[in-house]
Amino acid sequence: MISARPFTSGSALSNASNTLVVYHTSSATGRDVAVSGVISIPKGKPPAAGWPVISWAHGTTGNAPQCAPSRFATPNVEQRFLNDWVDAGYAVVQTDYEGEGTPGLHPYFANAAGAHDTIDIVHAARAIDPQIGERWVVMGHSEGGTIALFAAEIAPSWAPDLQLLGAVSYAPAADITDVLGHIMTSSQPMRGLPLGMMMVEGIASTDPAIDLNRILSPHGLALLPQLQSACAGEMMNSPAWNAVAPNSLFQRDAPVNRLIHDFAANEPLNLAIHVPLLLEQGTADELVSPDITSALHANLCANGVPAELDTIAGANHDSVMARTRDSVKEWVAARFAGARIVRQTCR
């Protein structure tokens, strides 16, 4: 633990006692880094085993420090959703991720880093409040949905002092290598281009063998500072991005084999997860294709992961959280109650 102070800003969970923490964790390359986050504890008396914990991995906000959820002026859709979990009697811990809320670049989709952040904030929570229990469930949305999968794989070895009971992943991004291929070859402007370039910058930042000066065009290099100074929503609505031909940001015949390799290594298709897993996906998701999540589910099932997939008719990228609130609460409560039988959708 580096620091802890009461947290009452606009993004604090209104139904909890909130603490802003800065804590030690490990980067994707093994460096010690300082990461911020918020610990939200229900009001009242904890159960005998201590507060059950939900560690939340948030969706895409940006690669710059000011994009941290703890810096939001008002609660976003995820934080409003998390208030319900506090009301249900869970301590909710939310990492900001490396490079968001603290100095440095956020290694977007270098998922080992996000997994470390998401696990170690549980350690930070237990360090400041002994009434927080050792049993926890990891949950996440979008970028965080993918991070939750990576955290579920490494948690038993990374944090053997904690007891991970399950994982819930909402609309995880599982096809990032396809995203890279699309932005390198497409001449058609696309609103999601900043997200693709955030992946390029974030993943490249963890591998010294990748030199973006040899991969990106002068135009692409000129746009990099925006990735480090603006948040995702701002860039996605900016003409500087949404009028650009994606392939113009890359050099012709650039040496991208290492970058492609690293993108593939950060896809969750072949993870070995040994706790119950619940995937939630809306059919009207405008960012993550239901077909991609179905393929992810099939891959994980083939790997022996005890996985369930719920596909929610008409739910979009954000509304899938609210639409599945009651069923996911029931699923999580069963994990804390010690239920071992999971409704399998692997066939």
Which ranges hold each PLM region?
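Catalytic-loop region of hydrolases
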Residues: 1-46, 301
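Short, surface-exposed "cap/lid" segments of acyl-processing enzymes
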Residues: 28-36, 40-87
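Alpha/beta-hydrolase active-site loop
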Residues: 108-130
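Primarily recognizes the serine-hydrolase "nucleophile elbow" in alpha/beta-hydrolase
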Residues: 123-193
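Accessory cap/linker subdomain of secreted extracellular hydrolases
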Residues: 170-268
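C-terminal catalytic histidine-bearing segment of alpha/beta-hydrolase fold enzymes
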Residues: 251, 255, 260-261, 287, ...
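Short beta-strand/loop motif that positions the catalytic acidic residue
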Residues: 273, 278-285
